[in-house]
């Protein structure tokens, strides 16, 4: 049996440290911890790393489709690795929660996240797991739009807390991974 962990984010160096790419950042942390190396898989519309966690085969996947088209890559990987819906986890940013908030659950809505919406639409089901990582919402006067906000870099204060936040997210999914 294989588990598929999909980080939602945008490809390209300009997006690496943006709020929308927190899913990719969490997968990078997991890959580093379990000695996985990402490689390109054009026919899966993604780069992926295979790791073993608690004797469980786990595929870490970062779609190359941009956030709003994530479902195409998830479906391709689901078919290629023959993964059941219960063994899919999608990691995404959540602007409806403050920075540092972590939520892990199954069978839930998109919360307005276009990558989650697209994944649910393409899979024709929301019966997969989600790890939502709060990145906050702009609240100061003259705040940039939501799209600009999620495509902007973390604040200095957030960067100082980012490793602990990612660790908190990883710990939240360890039971699902069998740890």
Curated annotation (Swiss-Prot):
Family matches, as Gene3D superfamilies: Peptidyl-tRNA hydrolase
PROSITE patterns hit by this protein: PEPT_TRNA_HYDROL_1, PEPT_TRNA_HYDROL_2
Principal location: cytoplasm
Entries under InterPro entries matching the protein: Pept_tRNA_hydro, Pept_tRNA_hydro_CS, Pept_tRNA_hydro_sf
Binding site for tRNA: 15, 66, 68, 114
GO MF term set: peptidyl-tRNA hydrolase activity; tRNA binding
Residue(s) at site: Discriminates between blocked and unblocked aminoacyl-tRNA: 10
CC annotations in GO: cytoplasm
One GO-annotated biological process of the protein: protein quality control for misfolded or incompletely synthesized proteins
Domain of life the protein comes from: Bacteria
Residues of the active site: 20 (proton acceptor)
Compartment(s): Cytoplasm
Sites annotated Stabilizes the basic form of H active site to accept a proton: 93
Catalytic function, reaction form: an N-acyl-L-alpha-aminoacyl-tRNA + H2O = an N-acyl-L-amino acid + a tRNA + H(+)
A family per Pfam: Pept_tRNA_hydro
Subunit-structure text: Monomer.
Record function comment: Hydrolyzes ribosome-free peptidyl-tRNAs (with 1 or more amino acids incorporated), which drop off the ribosome during protein synthesis, or as a result of ribosome stalling. Catalyzes the release of premature peptidyl moieties from peptidyl-tRNA molecules trapped in stalled 50S ribosomal subunits, and thus maintains levels of free tRNAs and 50S ribosomes.
Record family assignment: Belongs to the PTH family.
Stated name of the protein: Peptidyl-tRNA hydrolase
């Amino acid at each position: 049996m294989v588990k598929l962990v999909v980080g939602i984010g945008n490809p390209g160096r300009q997006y690496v440290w943006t709020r929308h790419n927190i899913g990719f950042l969490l997968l990078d942390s997991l890959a580093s911890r379990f000695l996985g190396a990402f490689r390109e898989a054009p026919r899966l519309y993604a780069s992926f790393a295979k790791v073993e966690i608690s004797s469980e085969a786990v595929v870490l996947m970062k779609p190359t489709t941009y956030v709003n088209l994530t479902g195409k890559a998830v479906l391709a990987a689901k078919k290629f690795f023959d993964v059941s819906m219960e063994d899919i986890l999608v990691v995404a940013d959540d602007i409806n929660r403050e920075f540092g908030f972590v939520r892990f659950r199954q069978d839930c809505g998109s919360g307005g996240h276009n990558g989650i919406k697209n994944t649910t639409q393409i899979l024709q089901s929301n019966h997969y797991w989600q790890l939502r990582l709060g990145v906050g919402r702009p609240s100061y006067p003259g705040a940039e739009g939501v799209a600009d906000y999620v495509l902007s870099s973390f604040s200095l204060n957030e960067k100082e807390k980012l490793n602990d936040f990612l660790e908190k997210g990883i710990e939240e999914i360890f039971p699902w991974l069998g740890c």
